[in-house]
């Protein structure tokens, strides 16, 4: 009977588990002066489209910074890696991003939680080509999520 390479089995299992783990994305936006109302319109449009078309988006919210009227924060919770890739490729999101660059000075994206290496590579390429700064805060493995809610 051949022996199993348990290290390799463990590595492959962790890839599957990582791709199916919920995580948080924060996008920090700074709108150009005089464009706040226009920006709020495109934010509302994309929010409605995401709600209708993305079941893997578990939470999607756009908040204003209390200390700066030009700054806003998207808070998004994704069911898994595939939900993020779907979001990036969703046509209404693409339209929003195009309009964003007309109405805003900047956007910076932060992700908190586990992501598969292939997902990080994909989003680094997509956001890098659009000059969108991205930072992945890797988990320390201290923390949890409730399977009953997310899976």
Language-model features, listed with the residues they occupy:
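Short S/T/G/P-rich N-terminal loop/turn motif that feeds into the first structured element of a domain
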Residues: 1-72, 79-89, 103-151
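A short, acidic, amphipathic alpha-helical segment used as a generic capping/interface helix at domain edges
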Residues: 93-98
């Amino acid at each position: 009977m051949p022996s199993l390479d348990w290290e390799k089995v463990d590595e492959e299992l962790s890839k599957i588990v990582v791709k199916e783990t919920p995580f948080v994305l924060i996008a920090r936006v700074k709108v150009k002066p005089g464009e706040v109302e226009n920006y709020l319109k495109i934010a509302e449009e994309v929010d409605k489209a995401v709600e209708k078309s993305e079941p893997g988006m578990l939470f999607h919210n756009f908040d204003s910074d209390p200390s700066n009227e030009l700054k806003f924060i998207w808070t998004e919770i994704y069911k898994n890696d595939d939900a993020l890739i779907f979001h990036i490729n969703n046509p209404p999101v693409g339209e929003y991003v195009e309009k964003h660059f007309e109405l805003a000075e900047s956007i910076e994206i932060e992700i908190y939680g586990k992501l598969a290496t292939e997902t990080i590579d994909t989003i680094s390429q997509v956001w890098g080509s659009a000059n969108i700064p991205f930072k992945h805060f890797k988990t320390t493995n201290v923390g949890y999520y409730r399977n009953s809610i997310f899976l």
